Amino acid sequence: MAKTMPRKSETEKISTIPCGERLEYARKVANENIDTALNLIGVYYARREAFGQNSFASKLPRSRAVGTFNIIMQRLAHAQCIETCRFWDKAEENGKSIPTIMEYCRNTDIEARLFLIAESCYPDDNDQTRTYHESLVQRFHTAERLIHKSNTDERLRRTQNFRNRIAHNLLSTRTDSRLLAKGEKPLVPPSAATLTALGIRTLWVSWLFHSSLNNADFDFKHSVNLLRRRSSDFWGSLS
């Protein structure tokens, strides 16, 4: 009987792809992720701007309408949780997560690639090329450090565990069962503050990758403020 070849892990599959193709894939995903990350922040503001002083929620009559509003808010919270976790899923050959981008850039001499980008921007100025190259490298490595930090972040762990509960309609996850078997409590769902912090980190890392790998930029603060104003205008129009 012929022996069954062991299946390659996702990281092993990625490592067999030529360096040039890996970098192009990383650049493509980094570009596509920016809009998705902005939409994630948009969901956050859609929830936040519904509450507060003189908000839509404060003007709702005490009637059955409140029940519908609460359902919408719950679904937005679930969407925020699920969308956040999609960005932090494990690296996959055809994936689009942040760890996937990092894995595609591994062992590709990324700093040399970033130097070519800097050189193309300042072909006749070595000093400017060097300075800009340092800036691109700093952005990339900042993203790398934030990814390593996220790997041990208890907030992300709680959020991913809750995502598994709601996405797969589970009373408890495997993680919950393991904790209970050890006499520990299941992980609590993420708070609104946790989802907000993870969403901001997600957008920040997505921007760092996009700006370094694709030499692209956008007004970070302006984009976030625009999302806030749109949500505020939306709920205000319903009041």
Where are the model-predicted features located?
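Histidine-centered, metal-coordinating catalytic motifs and their short helical/loop contexts
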Residues: E144-R178
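Amphipathic alpha-helical interface segments
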Residues: A2-E154, K182-S239
